[in-house]
A protein has these predicted regions:
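Short, charged, surface-exposed secondary-structure boundary motifs
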Residues: 115-117, 175-183, 205-206, 289
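Generic structural signal for well-ordered alpha-helices
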Residues: 54-58, 90-94, 123-133, 156, ...
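Active-site and substrate-binding clefts of carbohydrate-active enzymes
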Residues: 2-51, 62, 182-193, 197, ...
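An acidic- and aromatic-residue-enriched active-site/binding cleft used to recognize and process polar
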Residues: 11-15, 75-77, 109-112, 138, ...
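CE4/NodB-like, metal-dependent polysaccharide N-deacetylase domain
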Residues: 121-148, 229-244
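Short, well-structured secondary-structure segments
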Residues: 3-10, 16-118, 142-145, 165-170, ...
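Intrinsically disordered, polybasic Lys/Arg-rich low-complexity tracts
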Residues: 412-476
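Acidic, His- and aromatic-enriched active-site or binding-groove loops in soluble protein domains
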Residues: 89-106, 127, 139, 160-197
Length: 476
């Protein structure tokens, strides 16, 4: 019997949370981030999830001598916070990378919605994230996953053009219809791009329902879960089961007391001893399995909420106004050379800021609410727009300075390119000077014979050039 593939993928992201930024801070203070909260949460999640889970996975990889494999995607925002507040977390991920049994995926550096807004900015962030993964872990990512598994035909084509041949996304019902997520598919426009689809039911059994005591299947054991995996793959006759989830599931969303670490400790052994499945990384799945058909996805899908679309971030007027106003700054920023501004632009793109403004209720809303620093979506919107207002002032100032500098430089270049005047013979100069002097003398003699009225002289003496008043435009 041919073994089926089991692909475990974990998302790691920590947003750069904004501090309380009041209206009166606009134009006065350009530090936008709540460093204390970011540090506190990062340190806590590192102790509860990242460090113990990485330690467990390393033990499992060594125990099973390479038969157990996983995949990670770590946002650039999370990497920055690891380096700043918990460098030991990066070291623990490096140890996993060194085993060769952990694949590191590429995504948008800032865990942003750039793929929906700006193709150049999307590409910039992907390349920046790729460079970061190479820097921290010494590997070049070959598989792509977009922020929150957002995908469409258009995004898939862009991803392929950037050199990726495998991409992860959601196994959304309204896209698959009667088909199963347990197969590899291809992009509708670029058939060479292979798509791995999340099995959301089996993924959510661990990510959301594991510690729910009201759940009819509680408690979930490794043996019971293996039975579900086998039943699913036998029913679908598929090639792979993709289990994609937040890494914070382990120890943070589902605390240690729930038994989540014990479950994970025994799951690989239970699965490998059975022999039905082998653990595979996304790139290994793509290499081993051929696409059964293409998927047509004209509108973006994601792994968020029941709709599996992007309304979690762009579903109301608050979110749309903030999103449009932010990305309207891109063209100006593309012309200035200010790393600090561009860094702030990146962090303001983080999808979390828009999620905090969401006014819907989701099946996974409680998880996100746990990390939400705001009591209401309206507070999130007001605070974000205050920050954005200050940011736009800085962008406009830098843009104006850049344009002025460019104009000055261009004028100087134009003057340099003008042909130099020919030197005139001394005799000509002398003749011109003499003629000018003669004209001056004649004019003086002519005016000497005319009387000047005292009033006219006084008026002429007291006259001053007109001065236009500069009207300072009030900033909005």
């Amino acid at each position: 019997m041919t073994q089926k593939n089991l692909c475990l993928y974990f998302q790691i992201h920590q947003p750069t949370r904004l501090r309380l930024y009041r209206f009166f801070d606009i134009g006065k203070d350009s530090h936008y981030y709540d460093d204390f909260t970011n540090r506190t949460i990062l340190k806590r999640v590192a102790d509860l999830c990242y460090l113990p889970m990485n330690k467990l996975l390393l033990e499992l990889i060594n125990q099973h001598k390479g038969a157990f494999k996983v995949a990670f995607s770590i946002s650039g925002s999370a990497l920055e916070q690891f380096e700043r507040y918990a460098p030991e977390v990066i070291d623990s991920f490096r140890k996993l990378a060194d085993t060769g049994c952990a694949e590191f995926l590429c995504e948008t550096y800032y865990h942003s919605l750039a793929s929906l807004a700006s193709e150049p900015e999307f590409k910039h962030q992907v390349l920046k994230h790729k460079a970061a993964i190479e820097h921290y872990f010494g590997v070049t990512p070959v598989t792509f996953r977009n922020t929150e598994l957002i995908y469409s035909d258009n995004i898939g084509a862009q991803v392929y053009d950037m050199g990726f041949h495998t991409m992860l996304t959601e196994g959304a019902k309204h896209i698959l219809a009667w088909r199963s997520p347990d197969f590899v598919y291809s992009d509708d426009r670029q058939t060479r791009l292979k798509l791995l689809l999340r099995n959301y039911s089996l993924s959510d059994d661990i990510a959301f329902r594991f510690s729910d005591r009201s759940w009819a299947e509680w408690p979930l054991t490794a043996e019971k879960y293996l039975g579900w995996l086998k039943n699913d793959i036998n029913t679908s006759a598929g090639d792979v089961i993709n289990l994609f989830m937040d890494y914070e599931t382990f120890g943070e969303h589902q605390n240690a007391a729930s038994g989540i670490f014990d479950f994970m400790k025994y799951l690989p052994e239970t699965i490998l001893n059975d022999g039905t499945f082998r653990f595979s990384t996304p790139s290994e799945v793509a290499k081993a399995c051929k696409p059964v058909s293409s998927l047509e996805v004209p509108e973006p899908i994601s792994w968020a909420d029941e709709e599996r679309d992007v309304t979690a971030w762009l579903g109301n007027e608050l979110q749309q106004e903030a999103y449009n106003k932010l990305y309207a700054q891109y063209e100006k920023l593309a012309l200035v050379n200010d790393p600090a501004l561009y860094n702030d632009f990146g962090h303001l793109q983080e999808s979390d800021h828009f999620y905090y403004m969401c006014t819907k209720f989701f099946s996974d809303g409680e998880v996100h609410k746990y990390f939400n620093p705001y009591d209401t979506p309206y507070e999130a919107f007001i605070n974000y727009m205050n920050v954005l207002s200050d940011f736009i002032i800085r962008v406009d100032e830098e843009y104006s300075a850049t344009v002025a500098k460019f104009a000055t430089s261009e004028n100087q270049e134009t003057e340099k390119k003008k042909p130099a005047k020919k030197a005139e013979p001394a005799e000509n100069k002398k003749t011109k000077t003499t003629l000018a002097s003669e004209k001056t003398v004649k004019a003086a003699k002519k005016s000497a014979g005319k009387a000047v009225k005292p009033e006219a002289a006084k008026e002429k003496k007291n006259s001053k050039p007109a001065v236009k008043k500069a009207v300072k435009k009030k900033s909005e």
